[in-house]
A protein has these predicted regions:
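Amphipathic alpha-helical polymerization modules
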Residues: 1-91, 122
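Bacterial flagellar/type III secretion structural subunits and associated motility module proteins
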Residues: 1-20, 26, 88-180
């Protein structure tokens, strides 16, 4: 009976831990949603015939700042200091930024879980490559960081350059070059 009581107490403790971590993760996902929404707003604004080259440069600056915010959120740690998106890699930052601005994932592709009953385990975190790098479309996978880079690059072309950036069109980022 004591073993059963101890096991039940451990399951309850584990459920509390998972619930707390999920609240922290929900907060990060809310912030990610806000950044993605703003990026989509910028994309919609670029379709306006009243957007000047100067506005496009400002959009590029804002999108670059949002990429930095996405990078910080991707490396967010929980109250215990573990990376929310590091998989099983623990306390180190799962995403790295090189000198060329390329972001790579060095976390684990697996997720942590805790046992909360005899037959149930609940996830404690997410693998960052699934959240940020391996987003799927009907045709392929893409990185949210690369999509933002594509958008920024397209904003650096003047309006008459016959190049268009389309962030998250059909879940992907594309660049179209129109015939002259």
């Amino acid at each position: 009976a004591e073993d059963h009581k101890a096991q039940t107490m451990q399951f309850n403790k584990n459920a509390t831990i998972v619930s707390s971590r999920m609240n922290e993760i929900d907060s990060v996902f809310d912030q990610l949603h806000n950044v993605a929404s703003r990026l989509l707003e910028l994309t919609a604004q670029t379709g306006s015939p009243f957007v000047s080259d100067e506005n496009r440069k400002l959009f590029a600056i804002e999108a670059t700042a949002m990429k930095g915010e996405l990078f910080q959120l991707a490396n967010q740690v929980d109250s215990k200091g573990y990376g929310i998106f590091s998989g099983l890699s623990g306390g180190r930052a799962p995403f790295e930024l090189d000198n060329q601005g390329v972001i790579t994932y060095s976390g684990s592709g697996a997720n942590k879980s805790l046992q909360v009953s005899h037959n149930s385990h609940l996830r404690q975190n997410f693998a960052g490559d699934d959240v940020f790098l391996n987003l799927e479309t009907a045709n392929n996978k893409f990185s949210v960081f690369d999509a933002v880079d594509d958008f920024v690059d397209s904003m650096n072309f003047p309006l008459g350059a016959e190049v268009s950036g389309n962030l998250f069109s059909d879940g992907n980022s594309i660049e179209l070059a129109f015939p002259a």
